[in-house]
């Protein structure tokens, strides 16, 4: 068993980061996630948003793993459960693989909270528990997978910044469009007054 942990601070408010987290896939930084299906989404009586999603991924495999399972690429599935609590301003996301569970299990937990000293920033805490089963090289493979998770976490943070930039651009575009819509009738009204 291998445990991997990481912490990252986003220079964006919690609301922005959690919005981006829900729209993170697909993104060009991690093309291995090829599909996201929302299986269930509801708001409970206390106002928490619960989501259950299925992520479809496609991976190129290290040569040692290829020899074990006899494939160069493989499609895998991950189930993800998240809870967004707008009152406490926390988002907790838990994911686990549902493919190849007889060989490996990866249980990941991400928590997004406002930074204690600067509420305009958001702290992401990540942890993963990796267990390779029934293989004599399990500790080597667990280390290899931890390294892959670390690399993917970095790509995930880049993807979050990409989504946030995209969301901000969409908001600016909508605002500019709204300003233009308001000016056009006002300009027409002003022209009528001038006549």
Swiss-Prot record:
Q: Keyword Metal-binding: yes or no? A: no
Recorded GO cellular component terms are:
mitochondrial intermembrane space; mitochondrion
Lineage, top-rank taxon, reads: Eukaryota
Q: Which PROSITE patterns match?
A: PRELI_MSF1 (PS50904)
InterPro entries for this protein: PRELI/MSF1_dom, Slowmo/Ups
What sequence ranges are listed for the domain PRELI/MSF1?
Answer: 1-172
In this UniProt entry, the residues modified to Phosphoserine are 46, 51
Keywords in alphabetical order = Phosphoprotein
Question: Which family does the UniProt entry place this protein in?
Answer: Belongs to the slowmo family.
Q: What is this protein called?
A: PRELI domain containing protein 3B
């Amino acid at each position: 068993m291998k445990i991997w942990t990481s912490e990252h601070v986003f220079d964006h408010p919690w609301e922005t980061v959690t919005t981006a987290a829900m729209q993170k896939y697909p993104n060009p930084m991690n093309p291995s996630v090829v599909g996201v299906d929302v299986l269930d989404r509801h708001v409970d009586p206390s106002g928490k948003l619960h989501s259950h999603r299925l992520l479809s991924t496609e991976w190129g495999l290290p040569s040692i793993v290829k020899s074990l399972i006899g494939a160069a690429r493989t499609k895998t599935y991950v189930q993800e459960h998240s809870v967004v609590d707008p009152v406490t301003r926390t988002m907790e996301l838990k994911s686990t693989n549902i493919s190849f569970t007889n060989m490996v299990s990866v249980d990941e937990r991400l928590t997004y909270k406002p930074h204690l000293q600067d509420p305009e920033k958001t702290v992401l805490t990540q942890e993963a528990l990796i267990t390779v089963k029934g293989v004599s090289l399990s500790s080597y493979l667990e280390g290899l997978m931890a390294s892959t998770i670390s690399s993917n976490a970095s790509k995930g943070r880049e993807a979050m910044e990409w989504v946030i930039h995209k969301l901000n651009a969409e908001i600016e575009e909508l605002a500019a469009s709204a300003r233009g819509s308001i000016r056009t009738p006002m300009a027409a009204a002003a022209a009528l007054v001038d006549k």
